[in-house]
């Protein structure tokens, strides 16, 4: 028969769920539910999230929470999962509280109308009694209800569940028993498989050596740990035999049996005591954990219950310093009034009034704060009105709702708050007469009407010396006087100013910004540079190769020799342009030349553009590419370089003269360079002669030091060799001397022994006297 899981939660199931959650966490609900035979993973998760979670608040609902709940229910209807984390309760708690508020409001309205007002059974049912389960009904949400108390006698299923949970939850270290058994079975199967394989190979004549030892470790199955092999050869065992005989004689079987029994009893007592201590320790530990958890829960509940609304108090109307100033001013006024009353002048006594009759004779009480609107009741009325309204398809007027200040509003997630403040008794219309409707009393001691005046500091006197209406009266009198002035004559005057002068003045008054001026100057400079680049020759614009040195005289002479005037002018202008480019834009590494003959006329830009246009038009009638190729081949086959055709017609004498002049110029440059070199050499000798001598002296010293160092190294190596040989010789000499000393000592001992023996023999011999013994 299948078991239907669910139902009311018991205290045992709650405790098992807490322990399993502490071990498995909040994500392994299948494992958690495996410890509870009557609950599913979904029910376990719901029980934890709805009741057992320590973060769940189970205290009474406050007014702020009710307002927030109704406000969020108005913004997000039926979205209890979204509302719950904002309110700080669970979704089920929010839903139950919402329904309870609606039921209570409905009961109040029913009781106010025709409800039951009796006592006991005659009274109307409460909201809790309406939702209470009747006999035979099943709770649809048992996870949100308190646990049922445990019975005295548990069922067999409960006992089995409790024992299994205790056994599984107690194993907090190591692997599980099933996993260990499975690993042992796998290891045994591997061992048997390897054994069967070795047997089959051995039957086939193949011996396989079993090597289970890892590198650097010992195989305790094959080797003997801490083995000490006896020394090879024969040795005497009489001592061991004697020791064995003594131990055999001293051995008493009864004593050994008694000692073994005592040792076993001691071990059993120790094991019994250890098990008892472990049991007591586990019980005490579990008890301590339970007590600690209870204390923590009480502390959390106390913290939650202690979170009350902040006490809102108004700011003080008068500070300590102002009170002291008021007291001092009152004392000064009393002294002045007393002096005036004691004066003999009647006018003085009449002018000084009495300021003691202030409206502060009665004790000031803090008035009661005005009654606030009940937001909860208004929101419940709105919700019930919306629920009871008819469909919008039927038409009609909208349902009247309590909006504005009387509701929580739609401003945000948090409901609208009504700021509570204590009324100011000094700013309230009181008994004394006031000039205006709803104004502050104008008698002494009242708050003044004009802004900037301090209450209780400048009270009004009885003679209207400081009347507030004086300023208003003077202003009205001034306006009347201005209105009485005669009207000006109707004369029209037309004034015209020159527009140019106004524009110039405006331009002068307006100062140009520095950045705008720099930008304008930069644009003008860039435009001038671009125009200057366009005025250059095509060779400079296209950066074409050009001669480094230009002989202007030779080019001008060649241009003058051309018979055609137009061609001569073109050649002359080309020569002038080449020379001008060489002077203004010299090639890299070439010193710019200076010539007074080069004077290029500045051509207008319009004329230059017209000339370029004519060149382009004439270039359209250029020769064919075949003719150009033929001319190029002819010039290429000529041995004379391009550009030197002008020198082909010169006479031989002129060429010789030119070459001689070039040779003389080269010789002069060589001579001048040699003279400059000699001068520089003398100057360097003069400046660096001392350094050269110093360097030569240092070079000699370095050579001498190097030679001395090499000699010292040779001497050092020789002495090292001598030291080594001396050490060897000293050792040999010491050995020889020791041998000689040993030989002398041995000979001396032998002589002493001989002397002693002879002396003893002489002492034992009879004394001979005159030849008789």
Swiss-Prot record:
The principal localisation class reads cytoplasm
**A GO biological process held by the record:** mRNA cis splicing, via spliceosome
- List the residue ranges of the region (Disordered): 114-191, 219-321, 338-372
- CDD domains tied to this protein: SANT (cd00167), SANT_CDC5_II (cd11659)
Look up the coiled coil feature and give its residue ranges. Answer: 156-203, 648-754
Q: Which residue ranges hold the DNA-binding region?
A: 29-52, 80-102
State the compartments where it is located.
Cytoplasm; Nucleus
HTH myb-type domain: residues covered: 1-56, 57-106
User: What is any Pfam family matched here?
Assistant: Myb_Cef
Entry superkingdom: Eukaryota
Cellular component aspect of the GO annotation: cytosol; nucleolar peripheral inclusion body; post-mRNA release spliceosomal complex; Prp19 complex
Q: Which UniProt keywords apply?
A: Coiled coil, Cytoplasm, DNA-binding, mRNA processing, mRNA splicing, Nucleus, Repeat, Spliceosome
- List, in alphabetical order, the Gene Ontology terms for molecular function in this entry: DNA binding
Q: Where is the composition biased (Basic and acidic residues)?
A: 129-151, 240-255
Q: Which InterPro entries match?
A: CDC5L/Cef1 (IPR047242), Cdc5p/Cef1_C (IPR021786), Homeodomain-like_sf (IPR009057), Myb_dom (IPR017930), SANT/Myb (IPR001005), SANT_CDC5L_II (IPR047240)
SUPFAM superfamilies hit by this protein = Homeodomain-like
Q: What does this protein do?
A: Involved in pre-mRNA splicing and cell cycle control.
What family does the Swiss-Prot or TrEMBL record give for this protein? Answer: Belongs to the CEF1 family.
- Spell out the subunit comment: Associated with the spliceosome.
According to UniProt, the name of this protein is Pre-mRNA-splicing factor CEF1
Organism name: Pyricularia oryzae (strain 70-15 / ATCC MYA-4617 / FGSC 8958) (Rice blast fungus)
């Amino acid at each position: 028969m299948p078991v239907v899981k669910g139902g009311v939660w018991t205290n045992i199931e709650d405790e098992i769920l807490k322990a399993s959650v502490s071990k498995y966490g909040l994500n392994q609900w299948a494992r958690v539910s495996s410890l509870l035979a009557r609950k599913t993973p979904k029910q376990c998760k719901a029980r934890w999230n709805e009741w057992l979670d320590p973060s769940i608040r189970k205290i009474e609902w406050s007014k702020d929470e009710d307002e927030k709940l109704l406000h969020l229910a108005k913004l997000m209807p039926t979205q209890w999962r979204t509302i719950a984390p904002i309110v700080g309760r669970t979704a089920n708690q929010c839903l139950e509280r919402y329904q309870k508020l609606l039921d209570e409001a409905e009961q109040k309205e029913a009781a106010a109308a025709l409800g039951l007002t009796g006592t006991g059974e005659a009274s109307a049912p409460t909201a809790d009694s309406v939702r209470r389960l009747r006999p035979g009904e099943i709770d649809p949400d048992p996870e949100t209800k308190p646990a049922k108390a445990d019975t005295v006698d548990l069922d067999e299923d409960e006992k089995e569940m409790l024992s299994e949970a205790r056994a599984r939850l107690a194993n907090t270290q190591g692997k599980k028993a099933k996993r260990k058994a499975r690993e042992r079975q796998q290891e045994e199967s591997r061992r048997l498989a390897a054994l069967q394989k070795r047997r089959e190979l051995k039957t086939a004549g193949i011996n396989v050596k079993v090597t289970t030892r890892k590198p650097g470790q010992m195989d305790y199955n094959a080797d003997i740990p801490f083995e000490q092999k006896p020394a090879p050869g024969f040795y005497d065992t009489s001592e061991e035999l004697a020791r064995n005989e003594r131990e055999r004689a001293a051995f008493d079987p009864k004593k050994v049996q008694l000692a073994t029994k005592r040792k076993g009893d001691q071990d059993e007592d120790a094991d019994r005591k250890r098990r008892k201590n472990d049991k007591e320790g586990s019980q005490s530990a579990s008890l301590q954990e339970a007590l600690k958890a209870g204390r923590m829960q009480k502390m959390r509940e106390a913290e939650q219950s202690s979170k009350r609304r902040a006490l809102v108090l108004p700011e003080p109307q008068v500070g300590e310093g102002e009170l002291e100033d008021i007291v001092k001013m009152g004392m000064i006024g009393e002294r002045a009034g007393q002096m005036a009353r004691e004066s003999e002048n009647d006018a003085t006594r009449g002018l000084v009034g009495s300021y003691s009759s202030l409206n502060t004779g009665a004790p000031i009480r803090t008035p009661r704060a005005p009654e606030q609107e009940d937001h909860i009741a208004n929101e419940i009325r709105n919700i019930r009105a919306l629920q009871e309204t008819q469909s919008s398809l039927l038409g009609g007027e909208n349902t009247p709702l309590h909006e504005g200040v009387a509701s929580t509003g739609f401003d945000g997630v948090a409901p609208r708050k009504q700021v509570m403040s204590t009324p100011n008794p000094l700013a309230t219309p009181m008994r004394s007469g006031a000039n205006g409707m709803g104004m502050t009393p104008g008698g002494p001691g009242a708050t003044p009407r004009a802004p900037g005046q301090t209450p209780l500091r400048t009270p009004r006197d009885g003679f209207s010396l400081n009347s507030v209406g004086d300023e208003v009266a003077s202003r009205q009198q001034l306006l009347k006087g201005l209105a009485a002035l005669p009207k000006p004559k109707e004369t029209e005057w037309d004034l015209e100013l020159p527009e140019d002068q106004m524009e110039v003045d405006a331009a002068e008054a307006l100062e140009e910004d520095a950045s705008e001026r720099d930008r304008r100057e930069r644009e003008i400079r860039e435009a001038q540079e671009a125009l200057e680049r366009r005025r250059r020759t095509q060779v400079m614009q296209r950066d074409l190769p050009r001669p480094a040195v230009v002989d202007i005289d030779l080019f001008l002479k060649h241009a003058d020799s051309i018979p055609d005037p137009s061609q001569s002018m073109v050649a002359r202008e080309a020569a002038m342009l080449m020379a001008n480019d060489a002077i203004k834009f010299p090639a890299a590494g070439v010193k710019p030349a200076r010539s007074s003959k080069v004077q290029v006329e500045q051509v207008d830009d319009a004329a230059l553009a017209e000339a370029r246009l004519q060149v382009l038009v004439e270039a359209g009638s250029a020769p064919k590419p075949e003719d150009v190729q033929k001319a190029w081949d002819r010039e290429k086959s000529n041995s004379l370089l391009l550009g030197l055709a002008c020198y082909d017609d010169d006479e031989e004498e002129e060429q010789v003269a030119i070459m001689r002049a070039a040779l003389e110029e080269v010789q002069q440059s060589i001579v001048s360079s040699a003279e400059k070199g000699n001068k520089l050499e003398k100057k360097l000798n003069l400046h660096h002669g001392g350094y050269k001598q110093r360097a030569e002296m240092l070079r000699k010293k370095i050579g001498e030091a190097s030679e001395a160092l090499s000699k010292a190294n040779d001497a050092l190596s020789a002495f090292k060799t001598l030291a080594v040989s001396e050490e060897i010789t000293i050792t040999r000499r010491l050995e020889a001397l020791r041998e000689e000393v040993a030989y002398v000592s041995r000979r001396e001992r032998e002589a002493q022994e001989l002397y002693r023996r002879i002396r003893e023999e002489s002492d034992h011999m009879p004394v001979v006297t005159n030849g008789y013994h």
